[in-house]
Amino acid sequence: MSTENMILDVHLAEEALPKKAGGPQSSRRCMLLSLLSFLLVAGATTLFCLLHFGVIGPQKEELPDGLRLVNPLTQTLTLRSSGIPSDKPAAHVIANPQNKGELQWLNRRANTLLTNGMQLVDNQLVVPSDGLYLIYSQVLFTGLGCPSTPVLFTHTVSCVAVSYNNKVNLLSAIKSPCQKETAEGAEAKPWYEPIYQGGVFQLQKGDRLSAEVNLPRYLDFAESGQVYFGVIAL
């Protein structure tokens, strides 16, 4: 009910009351009606103001700071799409899904990155300048059933440094998807084994980085971009 309707109802109530001549009771009644009218008008006005300015009523939900999920890879690729200037070398390459016999890296594809001097040469990322670099890589293996001989997957990120020209492992991991052999006659179920590695290293200009696996035929290329290799200067 609006404020105007409340005021009108109070006036109509006053007119509907029988008017009596003078006396203490009549005076008290008039005072009570006046006080009631004032309280109704004041209350309605206050309620309208509180609702209008949002002091009461439904409140908008806001996410607290720090609860937003952030994908570091998406954040890195945004530098390219947004055109934000940056002099930091960066690279993000993905596996070639057409070449299932080996792990071949591609840079001229969607969601890949090669900026500020970074190069992809002979399946290796070449560092353009000295400094600290974040190196990361992810691979995903898949198969059907578990053989009698345990399957071991290795994922290695290596560096051939210009200073000593030897290949050194920077990151290395070994995993097995099978705990035991699939029983004879049992249904062979699919399995998936991801490996993710990352670390910060001091590199020199001309250092060559590579990411390799021992059994590339088990790599899962069902979705583009889920097998990747990247370097970001810090």
Curated annotation (Swiss-Prot):
Lipid-carrying residues in chain (N6-myristoyl lysine): K19, K20
Residue intervals of the THD domain: 89-234
Keyword flag Transferase: no
PTM remark: The soluble form derives from the membrane form by proteolytic processing. The membrane-bound form is further proteolytically processed by SPPL2A or SPPL2B through regulated intramembrane proteolysis producing TNF intracellular domains (ICD1 and ICD2) released in the cytosol and TNF C-domain 1 and C-domain 2 secreted into the extracellular space.
Glycosylation sites: S82
Cystines in this chain: C146-C178
Membrane topology field: Single-pass type II membrane protein
Positions bearing the site annotation: Cleavage: S34, L35, L39, L40, C49, L50, L51, H52, T78, L79
Record PTM Phosphoserine, positions in chain: S2
Keywords: Cell membrane, Cytokine, Disulfide bond, Glycoprotein, Lipoprotein, Membrane, Myristate, Phosphoprotein, Secreted, Signal-anchor, Transmembrane, Transmembrane helix
A matching Pfam family: TNF
Topological domain spans for side Cytoplasmic: 1-35
GO cellular component: cell surface; extracellular space; plasma membrane
Listed SUPFAM superfamilies: TNF-like (SSF49842)
Cell compartment(s), UniProt: Cell membrane
GO molecular function, one term: cytokine activity
Coiled coil region boundaries: none
GO BP: any one term: regulation of multicellular organismal process
Segments crossing the lipid bilayer: 36-56
Domain of life: Eukaryota
Function: Cytokine that binds to TNFRSF1A/TNFR1 and TNFRSF1B/TNFBR. It is mainly secreted by macrophages and can induce cell death of certain tumor cell lines. It is potent pyrogen causing fever by direct action or by stimulation of interleukin-1 secretion and is implicated in the induction of cachexia, Under certain conditions it can stimulate cell proliferation and induce cell differentiation. Induces insulin resistance in adipocytes via inhibition of insulin-induced IRS1 tyrosine phosphorylation and insulin-induced glucose uptake. The TNF intracellular domain (ICD) form induces IL12 production in dendritic cells.
Family indicated by similarity: Belongs to the tumor necrosis factor family.
The protein's assembly and partners: Homotrimer. Interacts with SPPL2B.
Record-linked PANTHER family: TUMOR NECROSIS FACTOR (PTHR11471:SF23), TUMOR NECROSIS FACTOR FAMILY MEMBER (PTHR11471)
Protein name: Tumor necrosis factor
Gene name per UniProt: TNF
